[in-house]
Amino acid sequence: MGSRPYRRRLAWGAAALLAAGVAVPAAYAASDSGDASGQGAPAALSAGHGAKKAKNVILLIGDGMGDSEITLARDYTVGAAGRLNMDKFPLTGSYTTYSVDKNGKPDYVTDSAASGTGWATGQKTVNGRISKTPGTDKPMTTILELAQRNGLATGSVTTAELTDATPAVLASHATDRSCAGPADMKACPSDTVAKGGPGSIAEQSVNHKVDVLLGGGKARFDQKITEGRFKGGTVTQQAEKLGYQVVTDDKGLKNARPGKPVLGLFADGNVPVEWTGKAAAQGGTEPQRCVTSNPERKAGTPSLDDQTRKALQLLEAKQKGSGKGFFLQVEGASIDKRDHAADPCGQIGETAALDRAVKVARAYAAAHPDTLVITTADHAHTSQIVPLEATPPGLSSTLVTNEGGRLKVNYSTNTPGKAQEHTGTQVRIAAQGPQAERVLGVTDQTQLFTTIRSALTLR
């Protein structure tokens, strides 16, 4: 008797999935088995889908975009009852994000290097490390490398420096995330070319011949190479010798043509954010509206959605007639960076920018239903929506939303005056397309690697 309500709920869940057009294995529809970790439902749902192949995968990462950050952007931009583009995916789950120490024991709050390594390689590592093992510091094969081996086109788009942790995990292996350019190798002596290593993150990224690399970090690529085949030149010059078209603004990006890889460098450092406003403060701020412009953002800086659209065009054109598809990662990086700075307007604007890129990706998938689109975060972050009458510790700001309401956001994960910190909570993962059902339930970040590998049948 005690199992009947559970079975009714399970059957209803299976029926809902069938109504949404998702094939449900008999094991899931008829069985109430599951494990204590909460992994049972996703494992069952993923069974029997070997023939359900994706030609393309688009992975969109909101750096630091926990549920609180999504809710804040939704409340401000489209209203509490509204829905963002990222809210419209048919299938949604959550995943855990912890990293590990050098002995493999959980470190409950990850950084972006370890979290990115999780989905890029399917393995946990220590904070600060880029796609290398936690104890022995050995390179681990990434999803982008597998995609290349299987003949897929590949791309990485970010609003951070292209050498920042999240893009770096795809096409480089580094002992420490700080080893961005040839002049930044202090923390990675064994990775230097002189020691037989692969060089800096910037050098590795172009050596990997990723078809589309778009983001910031021009200053890293303009550093001089001091060792190896390209000694004496800059990483940008190395890229050009390897056949890259190098572009630095929206006009150059628009004119980039398929047939040669593209390196887009749109800022010396991180690409400046789209929105500005007063940072949160002790005791709060006067109610403010965000300014939807930024004087530090140069004219001619392409938006994240425009970069995503162009990347899709280039990757599709490269594969025309081959029968093979592509893997593209798109990162909204400064959600995290403005969260660290307790800057609600900057944070909301960058979430809105990623949401427009999500719209582009979903539109592409609507026209190409063999495309798996996934959106998620690397980790959760600090911002919390609190009652207007509350006087919380830390830093607060009151915003006047687009629907005319007042909203108070608080940042209290570190002492005022210091950068706010990541949090260790699970984050949303949502998807549509072939094998999207794998994101359902509570999974772990490392399982995203398996989802993509399975959908693309990478070997």
Predicted segments, located by residue:
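Noncatalytic scaffold domains of N-terminal-nucleophile
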Residues: 99-135, 145, 154-159, 163
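Active-site-adjacent structural elements in enzyme catalytic domains
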Residues: 53-69, 74, 135-151, 161
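A post-motif C-terminal structural segment
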Residues: 54-56, 65-70, 75-117, 163-459
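C-terminal region of N-terminal signal peptides and the immediate post-cleavage residues
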Residues: 22-43
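A short acidic-Thr-Gly-centered motif at the start of a beta-strand
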Residues: 43-53, 363
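N-terminal export and membrane-targeting signals
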Residues: 1-17
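Secondary-structure transition into beta-strands, especially the periplasmic turns and strand N-termini
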Residues: 151-153, 368
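Structural beta-sheet core signal
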Residues: 59-60, 156, 375
